């Protein structure tokens, strides 16, 4: 998460923690025994916070191979204590895209016209002023960050072939696929 506004990150972080914990609990229930359950709980995704571009880039480089996705504001300082840059989020996402064209990115802003910047770097956009921002965020996390059901699609038509909720579903359907 890249955000310099304490009021916003104070509200978004609990939402993210709750979502990740809920997903971890669901994942842990598939464990064969208590030890595996605890191991799966400890292996849940970590959420890191950056307040400027430099910090965000350092964190991204540190965790790039294990990054599920990046959520960023559009406007924040490039350096600690520096002036806010109107397009810092776009600059960050452009740099990330050069390194990894597939990592999910979410650009959020209270300015709806910034949605165009999100499109330019193939990112999703969430309006901070939306009354259902929490729901939009959860939906994007579930659909693009690797949470939720595993959906198998026909590569030609993109039609859903199968939806697997857990390993049991995979076992039950493996020969049908």
Locate each region found by the language model.
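CheY-like receiver
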Residues: 1-14, 59-62, 136, 138-140, 145-177
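Well-ordered, non-membrane alpha-helical segments in soluble/globular domains
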Residues: 22, 27, 85-94
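Short acidic-hydrophobic, aromatic-tinged amphipathic segments that line or gate anion-handling sites
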Residues: 48-51, 125-129
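A short, hydrophobic beta-strand element within the central beta-sheet of small alpha/beta folds
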Residues: 68-72, 90-127
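Conserved acidic segment of CheY-like receiver
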Residues: 1-7, 12-36, 49
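Acidic, metal-coordinating helix/loop segments flanking the phosphotransfer/catalytic sites
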Residues: 27-69, 77
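Short, flexible/disordered intra-domain loops and linkers
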Residues: 11-14, 78-88
């Amino acid at each position: 998460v890249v955000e310099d506004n304490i009021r916003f990150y104070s509200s978004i972080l609990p939402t993210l923690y709750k979502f990740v914990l809920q997903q971890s609990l669901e994942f842990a229930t598939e464990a064969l025994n208590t030890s595996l359950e605890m191991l799966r709980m400890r292996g849940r995704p970590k959420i890191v916070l950056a307040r400027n571009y430099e910090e965000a880039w350092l964190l991204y480089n540190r965790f790039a191979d294990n990054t599920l996705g990046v959520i960023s504001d559009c406007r924040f300082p490039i350096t600690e204590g520096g002036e806010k840059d109107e397009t810092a989020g776009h600059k960050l996402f452009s740099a990330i895209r050069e390194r990894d064209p597939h990592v999910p990115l979410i650009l959020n802003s209270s300015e709806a016209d910034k949605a165009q910047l999100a499109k330019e770097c193939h990112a999703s956009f969430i309006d901070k002023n939306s009354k259902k921002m929490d729901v939009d965020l959860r939906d994007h996390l579930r659909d693009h960050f690797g949470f939720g059901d595993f959906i198998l699609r026909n590569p030609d038509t993109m039609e859903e072939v199968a939806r697997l909720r857990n390993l049991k579903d995979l076992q039950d359907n493996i020969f049908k696929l």
